[in-house]
Regions:
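Aromatic/acidic polysaccharide-binding cleft in carbohydrate-active enzymes
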Residues: 249-271
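Contiguous, structured surface segment used for ligand recognition
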Residues: 1-4, 10
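Short beta-strand/loop segments at the ligand-binding rim of alpha/beta enzyme cores
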Residues: 173-181, 241-251, 258-259
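Short, conserved loop/helix-junction motifs that constitute active-site signature segments
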Residues: 196-197, 240-242
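Active-site mouth of glycoside hydrolases
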Residues: 10-214, 221-229, 233
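FAD-binding beta-loop-beta segment adjacent to the flavin cofactor pocket
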Residues: 235-239
Length: 271
């Protein structure tokens, strides 16, 4: 009822078209399109609604191809989607349609990670395939009111950059009404690579899956060493850049995650 999501004039936050500020309270339902059937998906989204979650972040594709609980594949002819809608078949994308529209009825946005970073890093989406996939996604979902596009997927922006750029620009060429961001690797921010990209409407970072101050993992931390909760530094760094764009912590530290996920010699909670 408040209109589509836009970036505020000064670039500090997200708001609706009518000026109402938008507070992003996200839930990571990553494998929702693959693992849940219609009834389970509706139940899950309803529970999210009751708890106040207004953005459900999902992996549209976790693999190439992905298969859902109905045994339907996301691709039946590679990245050629011409015949993806088969008569009499409740296909992979029909189920995705259902999830998106069910969320819309509940006042929720779907943060669509177009494809997770792992298959792209393995070379399973070329630049030309990214263009074809982006065109398919944009044409199918440009008129849905509750889409937020996520490029990337737990991956650094300097890995397969050309593929991510091709995916983003092919979507934006068709769909200019939905916001778009880049979901980066833990303890990195999209501002490092894409702040000046015209397709990036707002930045995103992850707090990471380790203790603040734990220095074991990929070894790349674009912030000062600190043993305190320091995810605010990613906000500070991102918003110091020009042009200023809003920034979201797309994955704060999770509850019930192992105590120091990336170091097998560290303690972990097993209770």
């Amino acid at each position: 009822n408040n209109g589509k999501l836009v970036v505020s004039e000064e670039g500090r936050y997200l708001k609706h078209e009518n000026g109402t500020p938008f507070f992003w309270l996200g839930e990571t339902g990553w494998l929702l399109p693959e693992r849940l059937n219609r009834d389970e998906a509706e139940y899950y989204l309803e529970q999210c609604k009751r708890r106040g979650y207004n953005v459900i972040q999902v992996q549209t594709l976790n693999n190439v191809p992905s298969m859902n609980i109905y045994g339907q594949y996301s691709m039946i002819d590679g990245y050629n989607f011409k015949n993806i809608n088969q008569k009499g078949v409740y296909g992979y994308w029909d189920h995705m349609d259902y999830i998106i529209r069910t969320a819309a009825k509940k006042g929720q946005y779907i943060g669509m990670v177009c494809i997770w970073g792992s298959p792209v890093n393995r070379g399973e989406m070329t630049v030309e395939q990214a263009k074809a996939y982006g065109k398919f996604l944009a044409e199918r979902y440009k008129d849905e009111p509750n889409i937020i596009w996520f490029i990337g997927g737990d991956i650094r922006g300097d890995v397969k950059t050309a593929e991510w750029e091709a995916l983003a620009t092919s979507i934006k060429a068709i769909d200019k009404n939905h916001l778009m961001t880049f979901h980066p690797r833990g303890r990195t921010t999209s501002a490092t690579w894409f702040n000046n990209a015209p397709w990036l409407d707002f930045n995103m970072f992850q707090s990471g899956h380790r203790r603040y101050g734990q220095r074991f993992g990929d070894g790349d931390y674009p912030i000062e060493e600190n043993t305190e909760e320091d995810n605010w530094r990613f906000v500070e760094r991102s918003m110091a850049m020009e042009p200023m764009k809003p920034v979201i912590d797309g994955e704060p530290i999770y509850e019930e995650i192992p105590h120091g996920l990336h170091d097998e010699n560290e303690l972990l909670w097993k209770d």
